[in-house]
């Protein structure tokens, strides 16, 4: 049964099948090509670890550094990258065909805020009862939303009827 693979670069005696390495010291200076065991001895004398940085080059590039600190810094960088990464959410705005002007303006301000936050917006227009006979009013309303947001958003999904509601999805530019 093969030994389990560790994630991250190989260090010290985990580096196998290598006769010579290109050594970079702790200050970043190139120490040249030397035998693997000589490089390992230099690392032990300096109280540091020999870490394989570029395993695919010939000869492999190894660097003298504190492996524990190196792993810690790598984990911190990954955590910071995850923190900075924003997941795009789909926010929903619900409208009715007979919406008043003020209510419409309030909804449009919310749409604008969602785009500033980088979220997509799903505009849902719900028809009730006999409003289904006047789908053209609903389509005009969604076209108006599209026209007012064309500067800051692009249409990801054109208005389409699904059951008793018409749906359009907008994404920020």
Swiss-Prot record:
It is found in: Cytoplasm. GO terms for cellular component: cytosol; membrane. One of its GO terms (molecular function) is ribosome binding. InterPro entries: T_IF-3_C_sf, T_IF-3_N_sf, Translation_initiation_fac_3, Translation_initiation_fac_3_C, Translation_initiation_fac_3_N. One of its GO terms (biological process) is ribosome disassembly. It holds the Pfam family IF3_N. Keywords: Cytoplasm, Initiation factor, Protein biosynthesis. The keyword Cytoplasm applies. Belongs to the IF-3 family. Monomer. IF-3 binds to the 30S ribosomal subunit and shifts the equilibrium between 70S ribosomes and their 50S and 30S subunits in favor of the free subunits, thus enhancing the availability of 30S subunits on which protein synthesis initiation begins. NCBIfam families: infC. This is Translation initiation factor IF-3. It comes from Methylobacterium sp. (strain 4-46). The gene is infC.
């Amino acid at each position: 049964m093969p030994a389990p693979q560790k994630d991250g670069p190989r260090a010290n005696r985990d580096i196998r099948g290598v006769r010579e390495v290109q050594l970079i010291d702790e200050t970043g200076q190139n120490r040249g090509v030397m035998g693997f065991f000589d490089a390992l001895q230099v690392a032990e004398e300096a109280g540091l670890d020999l870490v394989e940085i570029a395993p695919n080059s010939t000869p492999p590039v190894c660097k003298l550094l504190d492996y524990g600190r190196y792993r810690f810094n790598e984990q911190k960088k990954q955590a910071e990258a995850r923190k900075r990464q924003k997941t795009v959410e789909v926010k929903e705005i619900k409208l009715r065909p007979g919406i008043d002007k003020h209510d419409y303006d309030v909804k449009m301000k919310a749409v604008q805020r969602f785009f500033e936050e980088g979220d997509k917006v799903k505009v849902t227009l719900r028809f009730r009862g006999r409003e289904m006979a006047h789908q053209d009013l609903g389509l005009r309303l969604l076209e108006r939303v599209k026209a007012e947001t064309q500067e800051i958003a692009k249409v990801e999904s054109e208005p389409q009827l699904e059951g008793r509601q018409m749906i359009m999805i907008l994404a920020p530019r």
